From Swiss-Prot:
Oligomeric and partner information: Homotrimer; disulfide-linked. Interacts with MASP1; probably triggers the lectin pathway of complement.
GO cellular component: collagen trimer; extracellular space
Biased composition (Low complexity): 55-64
Classification via SMART domains: CLECT
Cellular compartments annotated: Secreted
Annotated family: Belongs to the COLEC10/COLEC11 family.
Keyword match Secreted: yes
Bridged cysteine pairs (disulfide): C170-C264, C242-C256
Pfam families assigned: Collagen, Lectin_C
C-type lectin domain ranges (all copies): 149-265
Annotated protein name in UniProt: Collectin-11
PANTHER family xrefs: COLLECTIN-11, PULMONARY SURFACTANT-ASSOCIATED PROTEIN A
UniProt source species: Xenopus laevis
Principal location class: secreted
Amino acid sequence: MKKDLLFWGTIISLGFLILLGSGYCQHITDETCSVQILVPGLKGDAGEKGEKGAPGRPGRVGPPGEKGEIGDKGIKGSMGRHGKIGPIGSKGEKGDVGQIGPPGPNGEPGIPCECGQLRKAVGEMDIQVAQLATEVKFVKNVVAGVRETETKIYLLVKEEKKYIDAQDYCQGRGGTLSMPKDEATNSLIASYINHAGLSRVFIGINDLEREGHFVYSDRSPMQTFNKWRQAEPNNAYDEEDCAEMVSSGGWNDVSCLITMYFICEFDKENV
């Protein structure tokens, strides 16, 4: 671009000088007309480097460059501000039972009370509770239902006791050990034993007061009816003073100290 400007500048200057020379020679005809033609000289040596020019105007924004490679991971920044509190979490599972803590301090002395009436009431309550517990236990030990006649009720007690204890057990509830005084009653008790799946029970017959003289548990004497098995009573080892009934309905004399189930008998009028 600079070379073109220099060339055309030289041509224009040369033309201007030619015009001036031709006009000047027309007025001076008698004199010799000399024409000077300026011709560009040879290219000179390179000049010294000029001073740095002023900054040019900003150019247009170039197109976006290509995406560079991922840089190295930066240093961990400082902790940011706390965020909002999150929602309440679900209930966790129940933890293990903790260790037993140390005993606490002794409490202050209580206020003295007039406990005479209270002790009396508590004592009466204890008696009632004990009686109730005994009755409940009695009911639990009664098995195979109830057997009865027109005047009697029979209960089989599933609790092994000695003869005397069994008798006291029945008497404590208003009855006595069962007394089979006739064939019908004896058959009913035998059926009761079979139905319960037992082999024998105590019945209310003994000769505790007089050897060989058997009476019922109400101390009434035995009449003509009996169901002694063959060779019974035999008072084996000189210690068999009480009676049992086996599932067939027969009687044996046995020791009063062994334990077995028993049947209580109650009068319907007293129940």
